Structure formats: C-alpha cells, structure tokens
Amino acid sequence: IKSFQSSNILNNNYIIRTVSSKVDLDRFYGKTNTEDVINELIELSQPDPETKTIFLWPEGIIPNINQTEFKEFEFLFNNNFNKNHLLAIGINSYEKNNGKDYFYNTFSVYDHKLDLLHDYKKVKLVPFGEFLPFEKILKRIGLKSLTNNYQSFSSGKSREILSIDIEGFDLEVLPLICYEIIYSGNIFKNSEFDVIINVSEDGWFGDSIGPHQHFAHSVFRSIESGKYLLRSANNGVSAIINPTGKIENKIEFS
C-alpha cells in the first residue's frame, strides 16, 4: 500500500491525503482479516496530530463490514486519529424499509471517532456487478451479482453534493463512486462544488488496460467541471488532477 497527500491546501488549513492501496480481491471472500486491513491503512495514512487532514480511502477497501458496523473498530483509531482528522471512504450501507432490506454502495465521511457525518449513495450501478437485472428470474438459474454476498445493490435517489462543514471549515464535494466517473455532462447539473472525489475498486479489471482507461475518464471530468479531482483507487491509479487536466500527483498500480 502506498499513499500521498495533496499539495493543495484547503481553506482553514485542511489538506486531503489520498491513500492508494493494493489489497487483494480475496478480502471479499473471507480470506482477509478486517483489523489487519484497517491497521495497515491507518499506518499508511500517517496521521499527524497537529495537521488538519481529510483522509481518502478507496471504494470497498474494508472487507465484511458495513457503514454502521465500522463504528465497532473505533478502538483502532484512538491512538492515531484526533479532532483534526476526518475520514472519507467507500463502504457499503444498509437500510430496512417496510420489512425489506436495501443495500447501497456508499461514499461516507466520518469524524475521528467514526461517527458518520455525511454520505452519498451511488446512483449509477453496474449491471451484473452491483445489481442483477431481472433478479428474481435469473437467481433461479444460479446467476447472482458480485456484491460481496449481498443481494443486488439499490440505487441512490439522486446525485448529491456533500457539504463538509466543521469548525469553520467548509468544503463542497461532488462524490463519484467507481464508474460513475465515466459519465460526461449530466453529472454537473449543479456545479456549486469545490472538488470532485472519486473512490474506486479497479481490481475487477484484472491484468488489463481497464484501470488505465478508467483513470483517463477522471482527467476529462476534471477539465469539464473546471475543478480539482482527487482519486483514491484500490488496485488502480490514484491521483490529484487540477482543473486544466494536469496530473499533479499520481501513484501507478503494479
């Protein structure tokens, strides 16, 4: 696992530190210890108690837990994180409504005690990867989606800009999860945001050109919006891209 932080200083002296990781997809099948992954990510995040920092971790990087269950691992953060630190991460969430279970691919922002501050539920889902079309019928013949033992994900209601507002610090974030980054034009209906954040799990591409093609779309979204774009990927390319499309910092996967 490697990490880097942006050279971009945000208002009220916050920085964003992006963590780029290479955790095997075996974690989705019970072969990875959750605490070990969290501890490694904390170590690579290198939190400085005096530096106000938003740590950006990839999509689905922590195995076998959901957004609410993450709180149970607060003890791992106690010696490293303090009130100067926020964590933004892609992690699944769960709701129960009228007796029915709903699962979402979610971008979540936590404080240093792992109390949830904000979240965005992914709107554009990947067919067969995140949901199974005609699920009731196709499950009967053995087909299923690749959603880490969940049923199909549900789609969020709408694309939302998250307002991270804490102790005088205000940042308007447009979160895009995984392949939502490939959509041109219609993701910017509301342009009142400061930065785009894209979290992704690119391991599904395997040993192919896929992760590089996926990353290339990030450059175009940055140019289209005229905003900085910060990308944190597992098994993919993580980067900071400025509003002109220049890549200011990048970590290649290998």
Question: Positions of the model-derived regions?
Answer:
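Enzyme catalytic cores with a strong preference for nitrogen-chemistry domains
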Residues: I1-S254
